[in-house]
């Protein structure tokens, strides 16, 4: 089987159960998956990059992904996909994909983002030939967003139903 490499970009500010649903399902399709923790010039992040990267790593461990690349001699010796976290701080997403050898961008899709996501997918394909695949979140998770979680944090609400346990712990000890 050829090595199918995909990227899943996002700000992950913070990582949610919706993100983890998309990552888990994407890992069943691709051999190598890069989780691109990105800076978005249109957003002011709640968390600095190093905290977002660390929380994504902790969440991946919580969901049963190994923290580092498995050691094996051949492709057939490996159990499951390789999942790596990559900081994506500036530049074009398609250039990062080329650098990583990825041929597919995977995005979770909720209806509120559909038009914007489709526009970006067309632009990325026109610039580079890299395809975008959309995965619909599990229905109970389709309303979960980092924006909603940030609002709950600001208002002192319970975020535990919407985020991995590591995020709940982080904000339990880092609340303002």
From Swiss-Prot:
GO molecular function, one term: pantetheine-phosphate adenylyltransferase activity
Entry-linked Gene3D superfamilies: HUPs (3.40.50.620)
Enzyme class: transferase
Record has Cytoplasm as a keyword: yes
Endpoints of the signal sequence: none
Keywords: ATP-binding, Coenzyme A biosynthesis, Cytoplasm, Magnesium, Nucleotide-binding, Nucleotidyltransferase, Transferase
Reactions it catalyzes: (R)-4'-phosphopantetheine + ATP + H(+) = 3'-dephospho-CoA + diphosphate
Residues spanning the membrane: none
Subunit composition and interactions: Homohexamer.
Designated name of the protein: Phosphopantetheine adenylyltransferase
Organism annotation: Tropheryma whipplei (strain Twist) (Whipple's bacillus)
Gene assigned in the entry: coaD
């Amino acid at each position: 089987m050829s090595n199918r490499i995909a990227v899943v970009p996002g700000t992950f500010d913070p990582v949610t159960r919706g993100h983890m649903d998309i990552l888990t399902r994407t890992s069943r399709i691709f051999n190598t998956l890069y989780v691109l923790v990105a800076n978005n010039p249109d957003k002011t992040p709640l968390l600095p990059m190093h905290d977002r990267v660390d929380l994504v790593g902790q969440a991946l461990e919580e969901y049963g992904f190994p923290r580092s690349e498995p050691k094996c001699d051949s492709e057939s010796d490996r159990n499951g996909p390789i999942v790596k976290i990559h900081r994506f701080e500036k530049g074009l997403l398609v250039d990062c994909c080329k650098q990583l050898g990825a041929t597919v961008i995977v995005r979770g899709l909720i209806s509120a983002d559909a038009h914007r996501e489709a526009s970006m997918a067309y632009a990325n394909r026109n610039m580079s030939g890299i395809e975008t695949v959309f995965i619909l979140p599990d229905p109970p998770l389709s309303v979960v967003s980092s924006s909603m979680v940030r609002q709950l944090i600001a208002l002192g609400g319970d975020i535990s139903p919407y985020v991995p346990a590591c995020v709940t712990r982080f904000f339990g000890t880092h609340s303002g």
